[in-house]
A protein has these predicted regions:
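Extended, low-hydrophobicity, polar/charged segments
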Residues: 1-194
């Protein structure tokens, strides 16, 4: 990535930039949105007259460390942004005393059924309970929660309601007080400011 003037250039894993400003969420929106079969940001926006900057998406990953130590990760990012897995890998590696070997997105049904209970894939919110991790799982029994800078200042936003077919309006939700690590885990993109 580089600026038009040529005064700044960086690869996507190192680029630091400021995303566009979010569009404020309207005041008269219901607390719960019924969102059947609306599992993507585009589906939710198109069906509910929303903008992606008003949504926080939650992506789950599994961090696999040496000695088969596995940590589930909740990565939260604004709906118009994308997680940069290299930045996320580097941030997680700094958090733990073990050597991070692999970071993979959790999407396959077998992994979910083996390790998670009552897990609403496609409808996950930032307040997902640690009890969704099965006692029989080899995973650490607590989600490591990470939020990108682009989403950490949103005080009112839409995210998964932690139940199938529902999204929720979060108001006055403070990531600073919820055991979240705030960091840069997003891809820089055209139109960002430096």
């Amino acid at each position: 990535l580089f600026t038009q003037s040529g005064s700044y250039a960086a690869n996507i894993e190192k680029a630091v930039s400021l995303p566009s400003q979010p569009i404020p969420l309207r005041d008269n929106i219901a607390e719960w949105l019924e969102t059947p079969h609306q599992k993507t940001i585009l589906d939710i926006c198109d069906n509910n007259n929303l903008d992606p900057t008003q949504i926080i998406k939650v992506v789950i990953f599994l961090a696999q460390f040496e000695d088969e130590f596995e940590v589930p990760i909740l990565a939260c990012i604004r709906g118009d942004q994308h997680v940069n897995e290299v930045k996320l890998f580097n941030l997680i590696n700094k958090l733990h005393n073990f050597n991070l070997l692999n970071l993979k997105k959790i999407e396959d049904k077998n992994t979910i059924e083996k390790n998670l209970i009552d897990f609403p894939l496609g409808f996950i919110g930032p307040d997902l309970d640690n009890k969704t991790i099965k006692a029989s799982s080899n995973w650490e029994k607590k989600w490591t929660r990470i939020i990108d800078h682009s989403a950490s200042d949103l005080s009112k936003f839409i995210s998964g309601g932690n139940k199938v077919n529902f999204h929720k309006v979060f108001q006055e939700f403070s990531f600073a007080s919820k055991d979240y690590l705030i960091g840069d885990i997003r891809n820089a993109k055209k139109g960002d400011k430096i």
